[in-house]
Amino acid sequence: MGFKLISLLLLFLPLLTVTILSGVEQAFASDKALLVTGRNITADGGRSSLRGKKQRRASGCNLFQGRWVFDASYPFYDSSKCPFIDGEFDCLKFGRPDKQFLKYSWQPESCTIPRFDGGAFLRKYRGKRVMFVGDSLSLNMWESLACMIHASVPNAKTTFLKRTPLSTLTFQEYGVTLYLYRTPYIVDISKERVGRVLNLGAIEGGADAWKNMDVLVFNSWHWWTHKGQSQGWDYIRDGSSLVRDMNRLDAFYKGLSTWARWVDQNVDTAKTRVFFQGISPTHYEGREWNEPRKTCSGQMQPLGGSSYPSGQPPSSGVVSKVLSSMKKPVTLLDITTLSQLRKDAHPSSYGGDGGTDCSHWCLPGLPDTWNQLLYAALTM
């Protein structure tokens, strides 16, 4: 039934409106504590919820406060045996000589994250649908989860369909489908007389495909910062105003607020668990971790300790502000600080395109920990 529905969506999505451009088309064109979120994630399984602007400290362990420790049992899988990894994330394939970056696990301060079990995941979510919605960091996380599950059931029959904007991977025996919907801004980009317009108040292009999922994981931020040739729009529509540009944090706040209203109005959270993937950091500016003139290139170890020298980015504050205003419970996967500590985990020059990528993450690698935390939130 799920595949028939998605097939129909794929057939009719281009007909909904020729003016709505998928976020991925734009992408390919140039392509601490959780106290103010809709739901805290602690060792009590994230059952402590917040409403409105109330702040309440949950009991138990904060899974996102901790440090990286060497772990010889890692990684979860062999990249050469996973058929779902894009070249841009396959660092070992493109010659990364060191492998120490694969051997770190995240250790919270006062509890233990359950080790990921792909077979248990498939059994628990038999017949269920899990969707990642966002930019290429969502792609990073989607492919990571696919590889983690595949490593547990390497002989399982799968159906893999990769398209723009909607891709699917189904583990047939279990009826579990992982979806990826590529839309870098979440809100719409439309083609108008003046050019490409980023509409901060509209979510129409493809949002119906997000409905009726069992798990939704949203992500957005990186594309809001792009300028020049990599910018995905020509104008911004802010209410009745059409402007060439505006403060990017303000634009992100308004766009994310539109997403929040969409979730509040369209998602039955009694049936669907909703997550927002916290801001994924970049490592182009070494001064952020007290190594001026350095980037992620040549980095071979994570930062020690449990905090990042320059602190969290302002965009994380925007996410917290929006989530705290929502009526429906949304769980923040607060992966920002733990990811900031992993300056060693980017493709750098081993992403296959000849550039230096300090934005995405190698697979195997850091996104496996994001999925381990997602697994913890779903099972603990």
From Swiss-Prot:
GO terms for cellular component: membrane. A motif (GDS motif) lies at residues 134-136. The keyword Membrane applies. It is a single-pass type II membrane protein. GO terms for molecular function: O-acetyltransferase activity. It is found in: Membrane. Belongs to the PC-esterase family. TBL subfamily. Contains 2 motifs that are conserved in esterases, but it is unlikely that this protein belongs to the catalytically active pectin esterases. This is Protein trichome birefringence-like 38. It comes from Arabidopsis thaliana. The gene is TBL38.
